[in-house]
Amino acid sequence: MSTTKRCYYETLEVDRSADDSSLKAAFRKLAMKWHPDRNPGDASSESRFKEINEAYEVLKDGDKRAAYDRYGHAAFEQGGAGGPGFGAGFASSFSDIFEDLFGMAGQRGGRGTGRERGADLRYNMEITLEDAFVGKTAQIEIPVSVTCESCSGTGAKAGTKPKTCSMCGGAGRVRQAQGFFTLERTCPGCQGRGQTIEDPCPACSGAGRIERERTLSVNIPQGVEDGTRIRLAGEGEAGLRGGPPGDLYIFLSLASHEFFQRDGADLHCRVPISMVAAALGGEIEVPTIDKGKSKVKVPSGTQSGRRFRIAAKGMPVLRSRQTGDMYVQVVVETPQNLTKRQQELLAEFEKLSSGATQPEAAGFFTKVKDFFGTRGAAS
């Protein structure tokens, strides 16, 4: 009965003044929410879905909407102005909308050719800090799928060709009417390729590609960092049935270095020096990443942990003429396993020492003395 039907405007959750774009937007939103495929086994969602379709079919048509606004549901009852109808026109418009909803329209461009792009490949390579400093050309061997030479990647035996799929006509997808709406799915006859192979190539079993080891040259530029990615276009997995190949991505990682630590373009190192060298001062010689040596002047009275900068002795900056710096941190080494004579000399040195020779220690103990002296007076 017409009296049991909900108002079409209420069904689409829009005002009576809603324009075409508002109606379409509301329909898309509700159709997506209540589509049976998104609510399997829910009978109420299927019923709601039908109501939404019926309401939209009427309100999107100017003449039907005018009749509905004037007579309500009675306009489409037996003998009225004509029912909403769910013929071929509805199936077409409904299908177009769902192509937008589920992205089907964008997929059509690649159908019917049978070609598929090859997958991208990843290769992890570890290099040394020295390699990153000078750059190098490395040779790598990778297992990769290449186009079958026997069939030129078609998958068909020599002298034959793939045939257009008779089930989908080369589209790769088929449409199936279910009641008042149409669903589109991957063609089961060709698995979406649009072509079938009756006589497969014996060399590749119809795949259109075979597995082989391939040697490639990889150019590693100066200044690469840990995690740098190098792309080799077209060196990935071969495409199917003549499709384009994928790309190969080389991911670089830097091995830890026994002497240097890297921070961007700068290099850091720790150099132990004796207590005497720190006290009297002098020069120390340190290795550099370019296999050379640099001298660092250590002033007298240098404390452990002090850093010295050597300009332009770091790493080159990738794709730049700039170069980082090198930082040398001195670590004053406390003598161990002293002889009796050495202990005597150090004890003598301690007796001769004053606050002037050890200002930080003298200042510290003065603060401690003042602290406890203040607390004693307060108590």
From Swiss-Prot:
Binding-site list for Zn(2+) 2: 165, 168, 187, 190
Residue pairs linked by disulfide bridges in the UniProt entry: none
Glycosyltransferase among keywords: no
Subcellular compartments: Cytoplasm
Binding residues annotated for Zn(2+) 1, in chain numbering: 148, 151, 201, 204
A GO CC annotation given for this chain: cytoplasm
Protein name, as recorded: Chaperone protein DnaJ
Organism this protein belongs to: Rhodopseudomonas palustris (strain BisB18)
